[in-house]
Regions:
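N-terminal amphipathic alpha-helix/helix-capping segment at the start of soluble metabolic enzymes
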Residues: 1-15
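Glycine-rich, positively charged N-terminal anion/phosphate-binding segment
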Residues: 2, 17-93
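Active-site beta-loop-alpha junctions enriched in small/polar residues
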Residues: 17, 42-44, 72-74, 100-102, ...
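Active-site-adjacent beta->alpha loops and helix N-cap segments on the catalytic face
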Residues: 48-50, 111-126, 176-182
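Conserved small/polar residues in nucleotide/adenosyl-binding loops
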Residues: 183-189
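Conserved, mostly hydrophobic/aromatic
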Residues: 14, 29, 69, 97, ...
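Alpha/beta enzyme core
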Residues: 84-95, 104, 108-109, 121-176
């Protein structure tokens, strides 16, 4: 598999997960076959303000390649600057944009899954980050804000136009948060 110019030797990729994908967990997953690792979500504002605790989230294990760093935020200028800072600090191979976090403290600031309600803004963010870094940019988002607004296809098209190299779609909406999914196939007519 390839994302932009980054070759990934395994079909297994480690998803970014807040509070889970720290450096030790990423190393274990890499040793067990993950071909791509990713940090947990990192605040673009905290990177722009040079918060020391936030920089600890960027720690990598020796030889962690290919690796992605995931940032979140809703200001295109800050997101572009944060992407540059993250790449300069880590040498990561990919910048991943979190546009799917459903947690209140994130969406209440207009970040994460809140961007599902404003695809044009998401596109401006993606475009700014793509212009700011020389590595591929990817994005993770959800099926939609709620079941009445499942706009993931249109959202992906906006991001593609902005220059994003790949997307990952979380199968739940923001309203479903992390609830159990029960999908049934359509009944025959």
């Amino acid at each position: 598999m390839r994302i932009g110019t980054v070759e990934i030797d395994s079909r297994l990729a480690l998803a970014p997960m807040a509070g889970v994908t720290d450096v030790a967990f990423r190393q274990i997953c890499s040793e067990l076959g993950a071909g791509l690792t990713c940090t947990e979500l990192i605040s673009s504002k905290a990177l722009c303000y040079h918060d020391k605790k936030t920089f600890s989230l960027l720690q990598q294990f020796p030889g962690e390649h290919p690796a992605a760093v995931q940032i979140f935020g809703s200001d295109p200028v800050c997101m572009a600057e944060a992407a540059q800072i993250a790449i300069e600090h880590t040498g990561a191979d990919i910048v991943d944009l979190n546009m799917g976090c459903p947690m209140g403290k994130i969406v209440n600031n207009g970040d994460g899954a809140a961007l599902m309600k404003d695809p044009e803004k998401a596109g401006r963010i993606a475009e700014a980050v793509v212009r700011a870094v020389s590595v591929p940019v990817t994005a993770k988002f959800r099926r939609g804000w709620d079941m009445g607004s499942c706009n993931c296809v249109e959202f992906a098209q906006v991001l593609e136009q902005a220059g994003v190299s790949a997307v990952a779609v979380h199968g739940r909406t923001r309203a479903q948060v992390y609830s159990c999914l029960l999908y049934t196939s359509p009944s025959p007519r």
